[in-house]
């Protein structure tokens, strides 16, 4: 059984303040820290061979906190792919106790452009609820200077196909800690959702989603798998 575990990061400080975050690098709130730890409890008995996160700290914090109680007791280490010599481990014994963690901006949250840092309610008052709904929930309409969900998928899906999927085909169990929209674009592809269906897909913070790769397709498991 080869597993793909997807996890939206725990609540960030700006989630808590109801602000558009996007690529602004904001850490987890206290609640988000607890959500990440709780998420780790729910997956602690699932095998994990590789971890992938975005380059944003809330994604990295969530992955590291989630792994603190993993039953394998293995330690995640960040692989600096631009300088592989920096993170090379020269002890086979220690290598066996580690899990590589790779970061990529391809997994970053959707970039919200001129909305970043603004309060969602205030933006709705300024531009109208219908316009903001189009920016947030339509598939191809982007906010000013930002990305649509379609645009986000244009970077997440190639990275998944080129970097992550080959590892699943090798039987590696993968844990991805990322963001609401980058994960929605992946799930759209995994579950073959239409442009209309993906608009109603909501991902709560700190709740893992587990798929099994059968060699032919991805099958979604019940939350109690862990």
Swiss-Prot record:
Q: Give the EC number(s) under which this enzyme is classified.
A: 5.4.2.11
Q: Which residues of the sequence carry a binding annotation for substrate?
A: 8-15, 21-22, 58, 109-112, 120, 136-137, 180-181
> What Gene3D superfamilies would the database entry show?
Phosphoglycerate mutase-like
Q: Which residues form the active site?
A: 9 (tele-phosphohistidine intermediate), 109 (proton donor/acceptor)
GO function terms (MF aspect): phosphoglycerate mutase activity
Group of enzyme by EC: isomerase
Under catalytic activity, the entry for this protein gives: (2R)-2-phosphoglycerate = (2R)-3-phosphoglycerate
Q: Where is this site: Transition state stabilizer?
A: 179
Which UniProt keywords are present, listed alphabetically? Gluconeogenesis, Glycolysis, Isomerase
Isomerase: present as a keyword of the record?
A: yes
Q: Give the InterPro entries listed for this entry.
A: His_Pase_superF_clade-1, His_PPase_superfam, PG/BPGM_mutase_AS, Phosphogly_mut1
Q: Name one GO biological process term.
A: gluconeogenesis
| Isomerase in keyword set | yes
Q: What does this protein do?
A: Catalyzes the interconversion of 2-phosphoglycerate and 3-phosphoglycerate.
Q: Which family does it belong to?
A: Belongs to the phosphoglycerate mutase family. BPG-dependent PGAM subfamily.
Among PANTHER family, the record links this protein to: PHOSPHOGLYCERATE MUTASE
Under which name does UniProt file this protein? Answer: 2,3-bisphosphoglycerate-dependent phosphoglycerate mutase
Q: In which organism is this protein found?
A: Chlamydia trachomatis serovar L2 (strain ATCC VR-902B / DSM 19102 / 434/Bu)
């Amino acid at each position: 059984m080869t597993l793909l575990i997807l996890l939206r990061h725990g609540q960030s400080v700006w989630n808590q303040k109801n602000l558009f975050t996007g690529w602004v690098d904001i850490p987890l709130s206290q609640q988000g820290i607890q959500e990440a730890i709780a998420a780790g409890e729910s997956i602690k008995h699932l095998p994990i061979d590789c971890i992938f996160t975005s380059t944003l700290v809330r994604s990295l914090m969530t992955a590291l906190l989630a792994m603190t109680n993993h039953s394998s007791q293995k330690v995640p280490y960040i692989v600096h792919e631009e300088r592989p010599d920096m993170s090379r481990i020269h002890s086979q014994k220690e290598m066996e106790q580690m899990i590589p963690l790779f970061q990529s901006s391809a997994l970053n949250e959707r970039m919200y452009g001129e909305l970043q840092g603004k309060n969602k309610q205030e933006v709705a008052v300024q531009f109208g609820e219908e316009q903001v709904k189009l920016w947030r929930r339509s598939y191809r309409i982007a906010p000013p200077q930002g990305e649509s969900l379609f645009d986000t998928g244009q970077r997440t899906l190639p990275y998944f196909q080129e970097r992550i999927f080959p590892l699943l085909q090798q039987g590696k169990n993968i844990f991805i800690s990322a963001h609401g929209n980058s994960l929605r674009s992946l799930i759209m592809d995994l579950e073959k959702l239409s442009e209309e269906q993906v608009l109603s897909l909501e991902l709560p913070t700190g709740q893992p989603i587990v798929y099994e790769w059968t060699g032919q397709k991805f099958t979604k498991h019940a939350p109690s798998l862990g």
